[in-house]
Amino acid sequence: MSATYSIGRLEHANLTVSDPDRSAALFRELCGWHERWRGASQMGGWTIHVGSNDSYVALYTNEGRGGPYTKGQPLNHLGIEVDDLAAAEAVVATAGLQPFGHDDYVPGRRFYFFDWDGIEFEVVSYALPTT
């Protein structure tokens, strides 16, 4: 039996954060992304979309919910590819976040960090080191 598949791509991820403006500023600086949209969300609360022309991260908050938002707890981390790992790490540290788990492996290099809401990110570069 033969099946026909379309080629998929990740169009967006939706993250619940405590301060969408703060998170959007981090991603603009870290990834060179731009704000694509902001406004009230369908489920109440507020959302900012930040990303490239092809994909984005929706940064959602519902201030009236109270307490941590538990949907999606199985998420391990989101990976972000950058050209300059050292510059990316400087952005993360300047934001007051703690990079950890540095590793050089084939075919790249990486580090991790948790944002202000406990969401883990992996920052990876496949560019050849300049030193």
Q: Would you name each region that the model predicts?
A:
Residues 71, 78-92:
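Mid-chain, well-packed structural core segment of small domains
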Residues 1-6, 38, 93-131:
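Vicinal oxygen chelate
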Residues 58-60, 122:
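Conserved beta-strand in the GNAT
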Residues 53-57, 64-66, 85-87:
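Short, charged/polar surface micro-motifs in flexible loops or helix N-caps
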Residues 7, 14-56:
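Core segments of cupin and vicinal oxygen chelate
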